[in-house]
Amino acid sequence: MLENTLVEYMDTSDTPWCWYYLADCGQWHQFEDDPDLPFSSEAVENFYLKNSKAVLNTSSFSYKGQIDFSAMLLTDLTTGRQKRIRRSYNTEKRCSCFSLAPVFWESFDPERPYQLIPLSEHSPEYQTVDRYVKTDGLLDRTILSINRIQNLDLWELYCRKKKQLMRIQGIKEIQERRLFHGTDIKNVDYICKYNFDVRLAGQHHGHVFGKGIYFAKHAALAGKYSKSSLEPLPVYGGKTQLVHSGETKIIFLARVMTGKPVAGESDFQKPDHRNPENLHDSCVDVVSHPKIFVIFDPNQIYPEYVIQYS
């Protein structure tokens, strides 16, 4: 959501302007290239045309930022980091390296298939995820650990899929959600390494809304599909995991491209099962207020966090 703190009308034109930020790689990226930025060039341009001296505040699940048009700066309000921004024609050549590792990944090792990084409970990232799990996810349990999954291969596939869907559908934004998936702790290593496997989905719980990978809006619901275990979380490229006494459960918090949903049926193998055209991107239980989502292409999923709780 964008908030315009100053409003003043300016003359508009038909010039196809776009907005760019200077990335850590030293190249200019269009705002749409970063999935974490909750605003598009078009939205920013509309506010700029109203007042070129305005200050915009914006927030999403994982990002709180501010754009100062006078200073031409983009500020991350959580970390205080600033990036230069500029306004230019949309014909400008764009840098394509946006799918490199996100800047907040720590101790990133590109030689490893993935890393499972425990978050400090005092970090803003931990507190954001913890609050989302309990408030939006309705999980009334004691969270023992939150681990960030750092898998560059899966991240690149997700970014490419997002650009492909937007290009095919002729849209500038596609609906993304943070959704939960419950599973056994023995599956953590496989999912972190290879992503969720549609071929293995529904083996134990059926295919009520389609033969795909199931996600829940609420962590409490996803937790019902996670078995209690005495096993510790696997360690791969991260710090040594604490061994918690007693049985624990795990759930994944994933970034999911749900796009345009359609009501699912048990025999569906893709959202538009009986239509040769792909008009929808996911299946749901109830289109108006979905709580269950079914994804048929793993590239529409990036597993972001593993959450362990008792």
Predicted regions and their residues:
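Internal glycine-rich, Lys/Arg-flanked active-site/core loops of soluble domains
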Residues: 100-210
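Eukaryotic intrinsically disordered and solvent-exposed regulatory patches
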Residues: 3-7, 40-44, 50-54, 58-62, ...
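Conserved beta-strand elements of beta-rich interaction domains across eukaryotes
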Residues: 24-27, 61-63, 73-74, 79-81, ...
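Beta-strand-rich binding-surface signature
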Residues: 14-18, 51-55, 64-66, 71-73, ...
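Short coil/turn segments at secondary-structure boundaries
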Residues: 6-7, 25, 32-35, 70-71, ...
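Segments that shape or occlude catalytic/ligand-binding pockets
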Residues: 167-171, 177, 185-310
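Residues in well-ordered beta-strands of folded domains
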Residues: 20, 75, 86, 147, ...
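Eukaryote-biased intrinsically disordered, low-complexity acidic regions enriched in Ser/Thr/Pro
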Residues: 1-121, 125-128, 137-140
